[in-house]
Amino acid sequence: MTNIRKSHPLIKIINESFIDLPAPSNISAWWNFGSLLGVCLILQILTGLFLAMHYTSDTATAFSSVTHICRDVNYGWIIRYMHANGASMFFICLFMHVGRGMYYGSHTFSETWNIGILLLFAVMATAFMGYVLPWGQMSFWGATVITNLLSAIPYIGTNLVEWIWGGFSVDKATLTRFFAFHFILPFIISALAAVHLLFLHETGSNNPSGLTSDSDKIPFHPYYTIKDILGLLLLILILMLLVLFSPDLLGDPDNYTPANPLNTPPHIKPEWYFLFAYAILRSIPNKLGGVTALVLSILILAILPLLNTSKQRGMMFRPLSQCLFWLLVADLLTLTWIGGQPVEHPFITIGQLASILYFLTILILMPISGMIENQLLKW
C-alpha cells in the first residue's frame, strides 16, 4: 500500500510543500522568515477573529468596545495586545524577508517576487485600516491625513477621497467600511501567500551562494522543520515579552484619547513600520510629488530585476554591493527615526537627504557597483 502521505489528493499537496520538499542544503536562518510570516498571519487572523466578536464598528461605541475588550472580556487584554504587537512582529519579519530577497538576488524569480510586492501592499493596507479601528485620536487623524493624500490625484482626487470616506469627512461610514476591509483582507493575503508558495516551488528556493543547488538537495522535514521551530520559539518569546512587559511600547499615547475631530494632535504620525515611507512623503514640499514618492518607495522593488547589472546573483561575493546594501538599511533606519520627529529644522533637511539617498542608492549606485564588480571579475 502506498503511503497515504503520498497518495491522498489533499495530504499530497501538504507533503510536497512542507515534508518531502527538496530544499538547498545551505540555506541560512534568513530563509526562516517565510514560515514566520505564515505563523504571524495565522496568529493575526485568530486573534482578530476573537476581537471582532466583541468590537463594534460605530463611531459612538468603537472606543468603548476596545476598552470593554481590555477590561471585561476574559483574557481580552492579551488578545488585543497580541494582535497589536503581532502586527509589529509581522512587519519586522516582512522587512527581514524582503531584505533577504534583495541581498541574495531572489528577485530573479519574477512571479514570486511580484506576488510578494502585492502581498506587501496588501499587508500595509490591512495594518493601516486596523490602526483606524480603535477610534482614538491617532486613529482618526491618521485616517484623515492618509486618505486625504488621494486628493492629490489630478481631476478625480477630491471625488475619490469622498467616495472612500462615504461622506465629507472621516465618519461612521468610513469606520464601518474599514472594519469590513480589515476583516476580509487577511483572507485575500492568505490566498496570495498560497500563490506565492506555488510559484516559489515551481523554481525551488534560492540559497546564499546564488548558485544552482539542484545537485545538492535535502528534504525539508526534519532538517528545516526543526530549524523553523527555533525561529518560531524566538518569535513567540519576543512577542510575549512585548505583550506582557510593555504592550504599549510601540503604540502612540494619543490613541488612548477618544477621537475628536475638533482637536488635532500636535504630531500626527503612523505606526513605526510606516514611518520610513511617511518621512519620504514629508520630505517633498509638493503634495502630488510627495504621494508619488511615497508609492514609488515601495513600488521601486518591482523594478529591481531590471536594475540588476551584476553577473552574480546574490551579494555574498560582492563587497561593494554589500556596503551599499547596508548603507540602504542604515538610511531606512534614519528615515524611520525622522518620520517620528516633528516637522522642523534639522529634521526636514535630514529627511530630504535620506530620501534622496534612498532612491539614489537603489536606482544609480547599486547598478553601477554591479558593473564595477563585473569588471573586477576579469582581473
Curated annotation (Swiss-Prot):
It is a multi-pass membrane protein. CDD domains: cytochrome_b_C, Cytochrome_b_N. The chain crosses the membrane at residues 33-53, 77-98, 113-133, 178-198, 226-246, 288-308, 320-340, 347-367. Binds 2 heme b groups non-covalently. A ubiquinone binds at residue 201. Heme b b562 binds at residues 83, 182. GO terms for biological process: mitochondrial electron transport, ubiquinol to cytochrome c. Heme b b566 binds at residues 97, 196. Its main location: mitochondrion. Its cofactor is heme b. One of its GO terms (molecular function) is ubiquinol-cytochrome-c reductase activity. It comes from the Eukaryota. GO terms for cellular component: mitochondrial inner membrane; respiratory chain complex III. Keywords: Electron transport, Heme, Iron, Membrane, Metal-binding, Mitochondrion, Mitochondrion inner membrane, Respiratory chain, Transmembrane, Transmembrane helix, Transport, Ubiquinone. It is found in: Mitochondrion inner membrane. Heme 1 (or BL or b562) is low-potential and absorbs at about 562 nm, and heme 2 (or BH or b566) is high-potential and absorbs at about 566 nm. Component of the ubiquinol-cytochrome c reductase complex (complex III or cytochrome b-c1 complex) that is part of the mitochondrial respiratory chain. The b-c1 complex mediates electron transfer from ubiquinol to cytochrome c. Contributes to the generation of a proton gradient across the mitochondrial membrane that is then used for ATP synthesis. PANTHER family: CYTOCHROME B (PTHR19271:SF16). Belongs to the cytochrome b family. The cytochrome bc1 complex contains 11 subunits: 3 respiratory subunits (MT-CYB, CYC1 and UQCRFS1), 2 core proteins (UQCRC1 and UQCRC2) and 6 low-molecular weight proteins (UQCRH/QCR6, UQCRB/QCR7, UQCRQ/QCR8, UQCR10/QCR9, UQCR11/QCR10 and a cleavage product of UQCRFS1). This cytochrome bc1 complex then forms a dimer. This is Cytochrome b. It comes from Fossa fossana. The lineage of its organism: Eukaryota, Metazoa, Chordata, Craniata, Vertebrata. The gene is MT-CYB.
